[in-house]
Amino acid sequence: MAHKKGQGSSRNGRDSNAQRRGVKKFGGEAVIAGNILVRQVGTKFHPGAGVGMGNDYTLFALVDGKVRFDREGRRVNIDVA
């Protein structure tokens, strides 16, 4: 037998906000310097030419141009040219 009554509603009611990660600019899109290309944890995507990486692995455009995704084996690089 239960020694406590159901604690349903008093223990529920928490939910965290989504972290909004993912690709923000897709292949072929025009970007300007400073635009965020990808928000990620770890290097799922690697920075290529014209792309910088922040402390939290965010990839951003260093130059104006078009986004290009490039595969080298398992490694996916993002270039802006």
Curated annotation (Swiss-Prot):
InterPro entries assigned: Ribosomal_bL27
An annotated GO cellular component: cytosolic large ribosomal subunit
Keyword Ribosomal protein found: yes
Domain of life: Bacteria
Molecular function GO terms recorded: structural constituent of ribosome
Gene3D superfamilies linked to this entry: 2.40.50.100
Alphabetical GO biological process terms: translation
Chain intervals for the UniProt region annotation (Disordered): 1-22
Keywords assigned: Ribonucleoprotein, Ribosomal protein
TM ranges: none
Similarity-based family: Belongs to the bacterial ribosomal protein bL27 family.
Name of the protein described by the UniProt record: Large ribosomal subunit protein bL27
Species of origin: Rhodopirellula baltica (strain DSM 10527 / NCIMB 13988 / SH1)
Name of the gene: rpmA
